[in-house]
Design a protein with these regions (language model features):
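Multi-pass alpha-helical transmembrane bundle typical of ion/small-solute transporters
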Residues: 1-341
């Protein structure tokens, strides 16, 4: 087996590692609200999230994966680019996880693709039509999440009659079960969108370095779908408690109510599922964090939002693109020093 083939296999392992980290970094997206409202015990919530992440990644088509494979032109893809992209995304994901900052794995990946593509071939190394489509989705989803969280929370409070007087130790059973269903839907939708990003990267590696076996960028092999789904599910079950605490307790100064948790989770699930069907790789992290903020505003007013946490989230959102792109570019140049390609 040639050195390039061995390194290509290593790149696939890195992609699976990214999916695993994505799972435990983004566990908070699915289970933070349902844990901190005491609707489910933490262990039950995390196992549920892992199983539904697996099913979402496996069952909801590959439209997002197809978009990921097209951000860098197929004839320009080299192993140094792919390895640089994965290293940059992994490093930034792990740094932010360590500090409990809920950043977007999607932002990491898209920015890394941009940075490595430009480093390798200048601005011709990126398909700008595809990139504009992706960036639009990443920009719009937090805004829609904020509005959706506010509207859903308002509706849930009105329909349930709970207002602001919920008993956190004994949640109303109807709202509790609706919240659990909404949380399960976030897990499923997260798998459907984020799992496809790794599928796209692995398919890109296979199409460019194992083409004689019939692999192309237009078809995601079933074994790749199963591998990506399994890695994300395992990462989700292991969990990322640092991020869970931030989403569950620090965005709002008031403890999350059951109606608020339902509103944030259900609006996030609907937005992510719609994006998955449209092939838009958007951020579950930013969508849900915005929905929690919108729900807090709707339920308790502006004074109950935690400005320091919101500023930290905004800073991480702003920094992720330049930092991940720079990490990918630096990684690419470093790899090229030791690469014959």
């Amino acid at each position: 087996m040639s050195a390039d083939r061995i390194i290509a296999i290593f790149a696939i392992i890195l992609a699976v590692g990214f999916d695993f980290v994505n799972g435990f970094h983004d566990t908070a997206n699915a289970v933070a609200t349902v844990i901190y409202t005491k609707s489910l015990k933490p262990g039950v919530a995390i196992v549920m999230a892992g199983l539904l992440n697996f099913l979402g990644a496996l069952l909801v088509g590959t439209a997002v994966a197809q978009v990921i494979t097209k951000i860098i032109p197929a004839d320009a893809v080299t192993l140094p680019i792919v390895v640089a992209v994965l290293l940059a995304a992994l490093i930034w994901n792990l740094i932010t996880w360590w500090f409990g900052i809920p950043v977007s794995s999607s932002h990491c990946l898209i920015a890394s693709l941009f940075g490595a593509g430009v480093a390798a071939a200048g601005f011709k190394g990126v398909e700008w039509g595809e990139l504009r489509y992706v960036i639009l989705g990443l920009l719009i989803s937090p805004v829609v999440g904020f509005i959706g969280g506010a509207v859903m929370t308002w509706a849930a409070l009105k329909l349930s009659g709970e207002a602001k007087r919920e008993d956190q130790k004994a949640p109303p059973q109807l709202m509790r079960w609706l919240h659990i269903i909404a949380s399960a839907s976030v897990s499923f939708s997260h798998g459907s969108n984020d799992g496809q990003k790794t599928m796209g990267l692995i398919t890109l590696i296979l199409a460019t370095h194992f083409a004689e076996y019939g692999y192309t960028v237009s078809i995601v092999p079933p074994w790749v779908m199963a591998l990506a789904a399994s890695a994300m599910a395992l990462g989700t079950i292991i969990g990322g408690w640092r991020v869970i605490r931030t989403v569950g307790t620090k965005i709002s100064r008031e403890r999350l109510s059951h109606s608020q948790g339902f509103g944030a989770s259900m609006s996030t699930a609907l937005i992510i599922l719609a994006a998955s069907h449209l092939g838009a790789p958007i951020s579950t992290t930013h969508t849900l964090s915005s929905a929690v903020a919108g729900g807090t505003l709707s339920a308790h007013g502006r004074d109950k939002l935690n400005p320091s946490t919101l500023k930290l989230l905004a800073l991480a959102w702003i920094l992720t693109i330049p930092v991940a792109a720079t990490l990918a570019a630096v990684s690419y140049y470093a790899l090229k020093l030791f690469w014959h390609a």
